[in-house]
């Protein structure tokens, strides 16, 4: 089975877990939790959120 990565926080997802968000244009996003889903829906950027993988990298540079 294929492992997927959470679109928002970057955490690896086990097969059969997580949530799938599909936009009207057909693009799909895999989320690991409702925390990631709600932050994505609110329009927050992963690079500005401290607890995400992208945020940790971005904030180290600053």
UniProtKB/Swiss-Prot annotation:
Keyword Repeat on entry: no
Sorted UniProt keywords: Metal-binding, Ribonucleoprotein, Ribosomal protein, RNA-binding, rRNA-binding, Zinc, Zinc-finger
Binding site for Zn(2+): 6, 9, 32, 36
Cofactor dependency: Zn(2+)
Record carries keyword Signal: no
Cofactor remark from the record: Binds 1 zinc ion per subunit.
One Pfam family here: Ribosomal_L24e
GO function terms (MF aspect): rRNA binding; structural constituent of ribosome; zinc ion binding
Entry-linked InterPro entries: L24e/L24_sf (IPR038630), Ribosomal_eL24-rel_arc (IPR055345), Ribosomal_eL24-rel_N (IPR000988), Ribosomal_eL24_CS (IPR023442), TRASH_dom (IPR011017)
Zinc finger residue extent: C4-type: 6-36
A GO cellular-component term linked to this record: ribosome
One GO biological process term: translation
Function comment: Binds to the 23S rRNA.
Family as reported in the entry's similarity comment: Belongs to the eukaryotic ribosomal protein eL24 family.
Subunit structure: Part of the 50S ribosomal subunit. Forms a cluster with proteins L3 and L14.
Name of the molecule in the record: Large ribosomal subunit protein eL24
Gene: rpl24e
